[in-house]
């Protein structure tokens, strides 16, 4: 199965219709497993049969990973049924991407062999005392003779109890600084019970099926060969490797909004109020149209950013935090608005709508898991003046391959990912040229509004001083970074519309007008209503896809 469409279709068929109450990999099974704070065993077995973890292994090592955007799209088939199941499997990417980025040939082969055999690799980076500040981590690896001795605590490790190996961030220099930490890749059987105490599992409100465990290590000897990359490069490696995951994990999570929309439609199209379908009530139609638009916005930005990792990998340090910040926020808000439409049905834990309350809980960690949205703005700020300055001085159209339905891309060069973009961002740079394109007449005023907003953002960025761009940046400065993410999303939507095949829904001006209207409201922090004709077109497309069992995302591919 080399073709992504074939693989995605095969996985959908293996997992079956999520609405089938007797399907052991369906919504009912996912909700029942969630009540037990686990994932459905039958669904786990299907993913093992499919060899899902091969999607995270580069083709050069025997896996299927050659396109990050394809990996994301396939994983949406898992996330849409059970986000916890999706995250538990995607957690292997958190660990393995560090191995692909900095590991020796032998370490890469070992990691690939594990994953291709359905083994698990846990990622042990964060510590509760330091949150997103991994440079402050205290878990230590001290050199003793020809080996290392590990000491410290890691309290929140996903699926530690099922791990065959771990990637650990450890302090190898007691002095603070950028070279104070290293990464370790070690087999789980080195965790001798005499020196390793397993900590109680953390219980969570959302993603309850993801088993969060911890360990307290005291003077554990490990061989020097467990070092992953050069000593002292642990934080640098993570900063480069996690560009993939900070982009990919929120992008996979658009499937949560797809399911929330699907459940809301199932409820409102069957329920009658005031002599008509509840779905026909104006407030309900508006909410459905806006949520559908938000889903397309999120996928436009995340697909463009994922492809940019192939085409212009230096932009990953910008696009990854931008995607995490905007997509996580939009998804959470959209699901909450749909909950108001569901009314008392949204918190039911039984019946065919029970998966909705699970989605409401599971979407929240998208905003703070792995890295918090606030930390994403902090990551963007130091690069903002350079990005805005270059976009203003040297605007250029973005490559079509960022947006088109089909694009030929080279395999990602993960070791080549960089810490900074050097001011290069093809999405931002394209906003200075979009008014020269053949735009739909009805959409041009909205495009002009976004271009004016970006010009104003560039002017504000030029006035920023280095001391304003630190972790203690004032709220107005942080808002500039938030506005930058909105501009990137607008550029992505414009590119998707421009390159869409003639006759395709994404080539129509209505969805572009809807997207730019929603984004303008986000930038001003004042929601703007969709024009009536635009709202009607969005609802019509949404209902048609619902009738034909198609994805609500950019691909519109068939779902089981």
Question: Which ranges hold each PLM region?
Answer:
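A short core secondary-structure module
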Residues: 153-197
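Extended amphipathic alpha-helical segments with heptad-repeat/coiled-coil character used for oligomerization
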Residues: 305-399
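A structural signal for short hydrophobic beta-strand segments in well-ordered beta-sheet cores
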Residues: 140-141
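A short, Trp-centered hydrophobic/proline-enriched beta-strand micro-motif
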Residues: 55, 117-126
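N-terminal glycine-rich flavin-associated loop
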Residues: 86-106, 131, 147, 269
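Secondary-structure edge/capping motif, primarily at the C-terminal ends of alpha-helices
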Residues: 268-275, 302-312, 341, 438, ...
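Glycine-rich beta->alpha junctions and the first turn(s) of the following alpha-helix
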Residues: 204-294, 402-488, 492
């Amino acid at each position: 199965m080399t073709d992504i469409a074939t693989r995605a279709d095969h996985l959908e068929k293996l997992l079956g219709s999520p609405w089938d109450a007797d399907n052991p990999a369906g919504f009912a099974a996912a909700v029942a497993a969630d009540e037990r704070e686990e994932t459905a065993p039958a669904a786990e077995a299907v993913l093992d049969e499919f060899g899902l973890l091969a999607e995270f292994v580069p083709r050069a090592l025997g896996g299927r990973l050659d396109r990050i955007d394809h990996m994301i799209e396939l994983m949406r088939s898992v996330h849409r049924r059970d986000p916890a199941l999706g995250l538990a499997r995607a957690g292997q990417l958190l660990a393995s991407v560090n191995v692909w980025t900095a590991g020796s040939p032998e370490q890469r082969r070992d990691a690939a062999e594990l994953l291709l055999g359905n083994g698990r690799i846990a990622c042990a980076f964060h510590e509760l005392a330091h949150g997103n500040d991994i440079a402050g981590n205290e878990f230590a690896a001290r050199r003793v003779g020809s080996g290392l001795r590990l000491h410290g605590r890691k309290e929140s490790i996903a699926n530690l109890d099922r791990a065959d190996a771990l990637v650990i961030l450890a302090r190898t220099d007691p002095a603070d600084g950028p070279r104070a930490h290293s990464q370790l890749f070690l087999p789980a059987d080195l965790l001798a019970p005499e020196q390793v105490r397993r900590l109680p599992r953390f219980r969570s409100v959302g993603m309850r099926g993801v088993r969060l465990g911890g360990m307290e290590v005291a003077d554990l000897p490990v061989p020097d060969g467990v070092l992953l990359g050069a000593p002292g490069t642990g934080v640098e490696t993570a900063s480069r490797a996690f560009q993939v995951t900070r982009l990919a994990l929120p992008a996979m999570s658009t499937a949560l909004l797809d399911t929330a929309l699907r459940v809301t439609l199932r409820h409102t199209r069957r329920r009658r109020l005031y002599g008509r379908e509840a779905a026909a009530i104006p407030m309900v139609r508006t909410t459905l149209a806006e949520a559908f638009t938000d889903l397309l916005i999120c996928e436009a930005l995340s697909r463009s950013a994922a492809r940019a990792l192939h085409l212009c990998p230096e932009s990953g340090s910008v696009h990854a935090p931008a995607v995490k910040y905007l997509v996580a926020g939009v998804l959470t808000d959209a699901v909450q608005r749909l909950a108001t439409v569901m009314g008392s049905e949204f918190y039911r834990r039984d019946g065919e709508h029970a998966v909705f309350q699970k989605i409401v809980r599971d979407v929240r960690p998208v905003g703070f898991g792995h890295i918090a949205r606030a930390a994403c703005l902090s990551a963007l700020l130091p690069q903002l003046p350079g990005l805005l300055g270059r976009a203003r001085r040297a605007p250029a159209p973005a490559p079509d391959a960022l947006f088109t339905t089909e694009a030929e891309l080279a395999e990602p060069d993960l070791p080549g990912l960089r810490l900074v973009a050097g001011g290069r961002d093809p999405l931002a740079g394209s906003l200075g040229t979009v008014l020269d394109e053949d735009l739909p007449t009805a959409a041009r005023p909205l495009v002009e509004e976004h271009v004016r907003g970006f010009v104003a953002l560039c002017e504000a960025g030029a006035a920023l001083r280095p001391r304003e761009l630190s972790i203690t940046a004032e709220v107005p400065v942080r808002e500039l970074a938030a506005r930058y993410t909105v501009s990137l999303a607008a550029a992505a939507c414009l590119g998707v519309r421009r390159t869409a095949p003639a006759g395709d829904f994404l080539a129509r001006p209505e969805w572009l007008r809807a997207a730019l209207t929603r984004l303008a409201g986000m930038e001003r922090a004042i929601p703007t209503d969709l024009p009536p004709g635009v709202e009607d077109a969005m609802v019509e497309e949404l209902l048609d896809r619902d009738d034909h069992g198609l994805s609500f995302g950019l691909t519109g591919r068939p779902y089981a």
